[in-house]
Structures are given as structure tokens and as C-alpha cells.
UniProtKB/Swiss-Prot annotation:
TM region(s), chain numbering: 24-44, 71-91, 93-113, 134-154, 168-188, 204-224, 298-318, 339-359, 381-401, 413-433, 461-481, 492-512
The UniProt record lists the keyword Glycosyltransferase: no
Organism placement in taxonomy: Eukaryota, Viridiplantae, Streptophyta, Embryophyta, Tracheophyta
GO MF entries: transmembrane transporter activity
Tissues expressing the protein: Expressed in siliques and flowers.
The protein's name in its UniProt record: Protein NRT1/ PTR FAMILY 4.1
Compartment(s) where it occurs, according to its Swiss-Prot or TrEMBL record: Membrane
Signal peptide from the UniProt entry: none
Main location (coarse class): membrane
SUPFAM superfamilies in the cross-refs: MFS general substrate transporter
A cellular component term, taken from the record's GO annotations: membrane
Function: Involved in (+) and (-)-abscisic acid transport (ABA) and in gibberellin import.
Amino acid sequence: MQIEMEEKFEDWRGKEAISGKHGGIKAAFIACVVETMENMVFLACSTNFMMYFTKSMNYSTPKAATMVTNFVGTSFLLTIFGGFVADSFLTRFAAFVLFGSIELLGLIMLTLQAHITKLQPQGGKKPSTPQSTVLFTGLYAIAIGVGGVKGSLPAHGGDQIGTRNQRLISGFFNWYFFSVCLGGFLAVTLMVWIEENIGWSSSFTISTAVLASAIFVFVAGCPMYRFKRPAGSPLTRIVNVFVSAARNRNRFVTDAEVVTQNHNSTDKSIHHNKFKFLNKAKLNNKISATQVEETRTFLALLPIFGSTIIMNCCVAQMGTFSVQQGMVTNRKLSRSFEIPVASLNAIPLLCMLSSLALYELFGKRILSNSERSSSFNLKRIGYGLALTSISMAVAAIVEVKRKHEAVHNNIKISVFWLELQFVMLSLSDMLTVGGMLEFFFRESPASMRSMSTALGWCSTAMGFFLSSVLVEVVNGITGWLRDDLNESRLELFYLVLCVLNTLNLFNYIFWAKRY
């Protein structure tokens, strides 16, 4: 359903981009390198914040957990705003530099606070108003920056290749998601080691240096990039189409009028017959067929986006209850070495990195071009949703075994029992999020690609927020979730998520077939 329009790009001087000189694989590769560095910083901070809020800023554990969840959720939710700015007012390059700088300033504020004792509460006291102001200003400056960076960088990298070469664009998004996972792997291994052995203040300092280096690397590649000039606010165009269609709702539109409108328009989109009521917007001479097709295409993406939120709600458990489970298991590999709880995601991330590399190196030789179309990405997302349901069922079974051994035999089971659910959830995340990034980029109008690819991250945010709501609702009704896992009914909560995601899978299949 993609709108196929002739794309015009410029170089950094505003002249027409030259094929072979501007854009290409090298320019797209820079986006992958930068994403590795930026995501390592973001996830290292997310991991570090829990200890920082409780040990240094003296917040209670529940308060700190809520602060971290809200920070992560807000960061991903703001990707839709970052994508909107990149599509509407700035080039995607300029949007990255702007939001990357905001993220860096926020990180510098928290780094200074971590090193200056006057900016930290003393003697176990709660932080003062000025201290809290510095903390939350820095924290949400990072969230705004992360939202803008993740909302603009994937589309910028995709622009360097374009959509005509389907194999290359598919390969880019696989390697881009590989970069996301690589950054995550470095965060839960190298950065966790630094935090636990050198200190969280050093972790902040290193994160600041890495992010500054990422921005420098990205800007240094400017001469080889190609840029797409923003086409104005896509949301304004969508609203105008709806307003025009509403005003002309009582007028009759003939097929001849629709064909004439499409013929007179410069739009070269593949016309489709969904949301026919929008055709009435074309009776307004100020509304072009291109605007109507943009609106129609974007609307068709929303059910796919909405069908992935429950899956991300399940993935959110890897950072909450699954971590709690890890704390009450046997994590010792030897007498002197114990696996840090924050590093439990290392093995799943390693599996994801291996799977992505093997798929890109060997899988693409098996698949034909037709299989790598939008239908392939829809199937990929569907497989991810199905695997999520299975993983939640497995998580429930593992929790039953863990609790039985702990309560009846006073034995801590090995932490590697949990790795199965971690691996399965990580693989489902890889299939779904990776599929969404490529699907939304390829299927969206060229003028809305940043905002459309941001839908993938926005789904993650809404999944995290929904997880918080579900925990409150389920616990308020049933009382299943308590501080002591051995007295909780966590396995029943996992089964609730399994059932909800399975119902959601059928909902997704319905919309995917209609697409």
C-alpha cells in the first residue's frame, strides 16, 4: 500500500544529490554505528538510574521503580513527537543533531549532580526542591533527546538507501536493529560491570563521553549524506483532509470525478479503495489526491501499530517481575562470581545478535524478492506476537517450578531456568519491532517516514505504560502481586498476559489480512 512517489534529495549545500556520491551503504552504516553508541548510553542510564535514585538520591524502591518506568515510557512515547518534527520542520539530520544535543545536555546535568555533593541529599534525607529540580530537568531532557533521536535516525538511515532496492532497505533495517541490540548488549555487560566495580558516577561520565562521540561521528558524515527537504506538517494535511471530507459528506462523488482528480494530481501512488469516504475531500480544490492518499495510507498503518501494544506489555516484564525472579534464584557460576541481575538480558541479546546476523548473511539468499515484501514483514510481526504468547506460558510454568522448590524444598533454582523466557521474549521483540521498523518505513508516505517509523517505538512506550496499569488493576482486584514472590501468584498474572496477547494475535491477523 506504499505511496510510490519520485523522491528528490539534496546534498548538504542544498544542491541536488548525486547518486554514488551522496547516500549509499556507507552513509547508512554511520546511522547504525551511531545507534549502537546512543542505545548503549540510553540503556546504561536506564539500568543505572534504579541504583542512583535509591542509593544517591534516597528515593524509596517503589518510587524509584515508577520513576524509571515513566522515564523509559516517556522516552519512547516522545519518538512520535521527534518524528513529527523531523518530517515537518527540520531535515532528519538536523532533528538528530538538535535532539542529540538536548540528550547530551541532560546527561551532563546528571553527571555533574552525581559528582557534586551539594546537589545530592545528605544523611539519608529526601532531596530538596533544587536538587529534585536538577534531577528531573536532566532526566526529562534525556527523555526528550532520546525521543527525537530514535524518531529521526532510522528514517535518516533509510533515506540514504531509498525504497527502490528492496533487498538493500530490508538489509539496512536488519542491521539497524542489530545495532540496537548490540548497544543493549554493551549496556548490560560492559556498562553494568563499570557501574558495579568502578561506580555509578563513572558510568555517567563514560556515557556522556560516548554520546558526545556519537554526535561527532554523525555530524562528521554530513558531506556524504543526502537530505530530504521537509514537506510541512503531515498532521495538518491529515486534519485538512478529514475536515474537507466532513464538509462534503452530503455531496455525491462519481468515479469519473475521482479518476479526474487523480489524473490531474502529481501523485504517482498506487490507488486503493479503502476509506472511500475520504474521496469527498478531493471536491475541495485545495486538497490534492496526494494528500488523500497520504491520509489513507497512514490510517491503514494504525491498526497494525495498535495490535503490537499488548506484546510490548509482555516484553516490559523482562525489566520488572522477571528481574525480581532473578534476584531469588541461584546466580552463582562459581564461589567468587555471581551474575548481576542487570546482566540477565545478556544471553537473550546475544541470541538476538546471532539470529539477526545469520538471517542477514544466509536467510536473504533463501528468500525471493516477493517474499521480502510488505506481506513478509506482516508475517514476521505475526510470528513475534505468537512467540510472545508461548513465552508468557513458559514464564508461568517456570514460576510454578521456582516457587515449588523454594517453598517446599527451600532450594533456589538456577537462574538459567529464567533464560528460556528471556530468550523467547527477546526473539519475539526482535521479530516484531524489527518487522515494524521496516514495514512502517516502506509502507508510509515519503513525507511521513520519521513519524511512521516512530510508531514502532511508540508501541513500546504504550506497552510499558499499559503494563503499569495492568499491574495496578490486577493487583487491586486479586491481590496476586506482593513484595514476597513466594507469597504471590505471579504465574497467574503471566497467564493473564498470555491470554490477552493470544486474543490480540487474532485481532492482529484480522487487520493484517485486510491490509
